[in-house]
Amino acid sequence: MPELPEVETVRRGLEPVLSGARLSSVRANRPDLRFPLPDGFVQRLTGARILRLDRRAKYILAPLDRGDTLVMHLGMTGRFEIAAPEGTVRPGDFAREVTPDDKHAHVVFQTEDGATVTYFDPRRFGFMDLIPTDRVSHHAWFAAMGPEPLGEGFDARTLEKAFANRKQGPKTLLLDQRTVAGLGNIYVCEALHRSGISPFKPSGNIAKKRLTPLTAAIKDVLAEAVEVGGSTLKDFAAADGALGYFQHRFRVYDREGEPCPTPACKGVIAREVQAGRSTFFCPVCQV
């Protein structure tokens, strides 16, 4: 599933085409994705102007001039194709370029400027909704979300409060969207390794002085991933078709059996299943 850097990469790819654009037509080729499309979806969007493109956690938000916000989530395999007057760019399929199958083209947006943005989703785990803009922060998807990890509201004090007296490992708590918004398995594994913290250590036993380096590692690994367009693994591609390259910088994720890259560490990267997900870590230098 695309994580925060991948979603931010898609948002940035869509922004030049959709931010400020008026939708001349909208077509929904089916009544549902993961969830049914909202009542009047096409009518409420047609003729509306998209004021800007935002991101909250793994959601792309498009506030409209009519008082609603279009909320989009990519799910597992959602992607966009942009066809502009200067040409069409098709998205890749993580590790290779593919031509999207038209049978998976579920929603098509056309702008007054002549651009067509098509949402493809073979597995239909993504979804779209229209929420009154002044109610977005109160919606069930967002009301309990923690701070954005790249924002000023996320710091060591956030983790100190979330970890206090908790027996769960830090990975489990960092994946909880109530702790911090948008973190996923890949980047939590990478940040914990950079900060030398075991994903299994009871969070309440982690010394407070270690939380500042952990916070910095989370911010650094996300910023680096956004800079290079996210990680190309299986289904993610940027809106302009570019593939992400952060996977080439992985230190532990999907590196089972390889030497730990930490200088002077003699450990070997291991993998264990934790809460149904693969956890990659160094059993020597992560304590």
Swiss-Prot record:
Gene3D superfamilies membership: 1.10.8.50, MutM-like, N-terminal
GO BP term, pick one: base-excision repair
Cofactor requirement: Zn(2+)
Enzyme Commission (EC) number: 3.2.2.23, 4.2.99.18
ZnF endpoints (FPG-type): 251-287
Cofactor binding: number and manner: Binds 1 zinc ion per subunit.
Active site: P2 (schiff-base intermediate with dna), E3 (proton donor), K58 (proton donor), R277 (proton donor)
Keyword Acetylation: no
Keywords noted in UniProt: DNA damage, DNA repair, DNA-binding, Glycosidase, Hydrolase, Lyase, Metal-binding, Multifunctional enzyme, Zinc, Zinc-finger
Binding residue positions for DNA: H104, R123, R166
Pfam family, one: Fapy_DNA_glyco
UniProt catalytic activity: Hydrolysis of DNA containing ring-opened 7-methylguanine residues, releasing 2,6-diamino-4-hydroxy-5-(N-methyl)formamidopyrimidine; 2'-deoxyribonucleotide-(2'-deoxyribose 5'-phosphate)-2'-deoxyribonucleotide-DNA = a 3'-end 2'-deoxyribonucleotide-(2,3-dehydro-2,3-deoxyribose 5'-phosphate)-DNA + a 5'-end 5'-phospho-2'-deoxyribonucleoside-DNA + H(+)
Gene Ontology molecular function: any one: class I DNA-(apurinic or apyrimidinic site) endonuclease activity
InterPro entries for this protein: DNA_glyclase/AP_lyase_DNA-bd, DNA_glyclase_Znf_dom_DNA_BS, Formamido-pyr_DNA_Glyclase, FPG_cat, MutM-like_N-ter, Ribosomal_uS13-like_H2TH, Znf_DNA_glyclase/AP_lyase, Znf_FPG/IleRS
Family statement: Belongs to the FPG family.
HAMAP family linked: Fapy_DNA_glycosyl
Function recorded in the entry: Involved in base excision repair of DNA damaged by oxidation or by mutagenic agents. Acts as a DNA glycosylase that recognizes and removes damaged bases. Has a preference for oxidized purines, such as 7,8-dihydro-8-oxoguanine (8-oxoG). Has AP (apurinic/apyrimidinic) lyase activity and introduces nicks in the DNA strand. Cleaves the DNA backbone by beta-delta elimination to generate a single-strand break at the site of the removed base with both 3'- and 5'-phosphates.
Identification of the protein by name: Formamidopyrimidine-DNA glycosylase
Organism whose genome encodes this protein: Caulobacter vibrioides (strain NA1000 / CB15N) (Caulobacter crescentus)
Taxonomic lineage from the root: Bacteria, Pseudomonadati, Pseudomonadota, Alphaproteobacteria, Caulobacterales
Gene name, Swiss-Prot/TrEMBL: mutM
